[in-house]
From Swiss-Prot:
Biased composition (Acidic residues): 10-19, 352-372
Segments for region (Disordered): 1-25, 351-372
Originating organism: Haloquadratum walsbyi (strain DSM 16790 / HBSQ001)
Active site: 131
Binding site for Mg(2+) 1: 214, 218
One MF annotation (Gene Ontology) recorded for this entry: NADP binding
Name recorded for this polypeptide: Ketol-acid reductoisomerase (NADP(+))
A Pfam family the protein falls into: KARI_C
Gene3D superfamilies xrefs: 6.10.240.10, NAD(P)-binding Rossmann-like Domain
This protein's encoding gene: ilvC
Length: 372
């Protein structure tokens, strides 16, 4: 297994050559900040045609950029990409002909894909990602003579595409890990412009910051923390004799209503929108559930992300054909709340809207739904 030493010490500032691991100020790039001359005459290879891949490729093409989609022979996405009017080649051929290689396949297969395409990277080319895992944890070691950047829309691919077509934008992230040409950041911002991110704002970050905050958020709050909280609340009510249906509504279904309020206007908007009874109960009881011991566990989870413990565990799990993952996933799918919720979700009109399940990403890890 390749060593998972983190690589923040090699991240350098584009203009000054200084460490950009910790940015003192947050820079947000908009349309006026983008100079399209840094991408307009270049060819982009988009490796993968899943959630993010199809959005990047189509948005780039509609912005006048020469795009090649890189898919292995036999990929089920080849016909779809061609039907969308895009040229399709193998990943190796696409990378060989491109100036920018955007790697939009799952984290777990990126190292193998890189092995297949690295000989096609010429000095001055750009190796681009939408998530920093494999660079940050040293699973991909790029050539020293290429730029390494990140452009990561903060939404599932179908929304990135839909917003672009509507003349709107999707917020995103841009980062520079390796800048050999001196223009890596300008090119990344131009790419973000071409896929529609600078319409809303592209936030500057680093590979370390994006990777570590993304993994922590998924584990402690969004995917791990939220689902564990929902299940514990559901089980508490059911064990106390309340109906599973009522427990489902109170602990899972209504969570969306609260999150939507927080999404739209922050915590204050949520508190201002619920009843006084709900507000007082939440303010006085919430910290009894999420207490200092939970904070200590969160800090432990963050430490495991920062020092590479989680990365090593996940890499080993995949190398062993995912035994723990398979067992845990099966147990989650067998939980009573799943059987209770299925007929209840049919009561809502949005359950008939297929777009709610259209190639959704795993939180902010856009490559997770990408094809090969």
């Amino acid at each position: 297994m390749t060593e998972t030493k983190t690589q923040t010490e090699t991240e350098t500032d584009e203009e000054e050559g200084t460490d950009t691991d910790t940015a003192l100020d947050t820079t947000i790039y908009y349309d006026d900040d983008a100079d399209r001359e840094y991408i307009d005459d270049k060819t982009v290879a988009v490796l993968g045609y899943g959630s993010q891949g199809h959005a990047h490729a189509q948005n780039l093409a509609d912005s006048g950029i020469d795009v090649i989609v890189g898919l292995y022979e036999g990929s089920s996405s080849r016909d779809a990409a061609r039907a969308d009017g895009l040229r399709v080649e193998t990943p190796a051929t696409a990378a060989d002909e491109a100036d920018i290689v955007s790697v939009l396949v799952p984290d777990t297969v990126q190292p193998d894909v890189f092995e297949a395409i690295q000989d096609g990277l010429d000095a001055g080319d750009t190796l681009q990602f939408a998530h920093g895992f494999n660079i940050h944890y040293n699973q991909i070691q790029p050539p020293a003579d290429v730029d390494v950047t990140m452009v990561a829309p903060k939404a599932p691919g179908h929304l990135v595409r839909r917003n672009y077509e509507a003349g709107e934008g999707t917020p995103g992230l841009v980062a520079v890990y390796q800048n050999t040409t001196g223009t890596a950041r300008k090119e990344a911002v131009a790419y973000a412009h071409a896929i529609g991110c600078t319409r809303a704002g592209a936030i500057e970050t680093t590979f370390r910051e994006e990777t570590e905050t993304d993994l922590f958020g998924e584990q402690a709050v969004l995917c791990g923390g939220a689902t564990a909280l929902v299940k514990q609340g559901y089980e508490t009510l059911v064990d106390a004799g309340y109906s599973p249906e009522m427990a489902y509504f109170e602990c899972l279904n209504e969570l969306k209503l609260i999150v939507d309020l927080m999404y739209e206007g922050g915590l204050s908007e949520m508190w201002n929108s619920v009843s006084d009874t709900a507000e007082y109960g939440g303010l006085t009881r919430g910290n009894q559930v999420i207490d200092e011991s939970v904070r200590e566990e969160m800090e432990s989870i963050l430490e495991g992300v920062q020092d590479g413990t989680f990365a090593r565990e996940w890499i080993s799990e995949n190398q062993a054909n995912r035994p723990s993952y398979t067992q845990l996933k099966a147990a989650e799918e067998a939980h009573e709340i799943e059987a209770v919720g299925e007929p209840l979700r049919d009561l809502f009109a949005w359950s008939d809207n297929e777009e709610t399940n259209d190639e959704s990403d795993v939180v902010s890890e856009p490559e997770a739904a990408a094809d090969d």
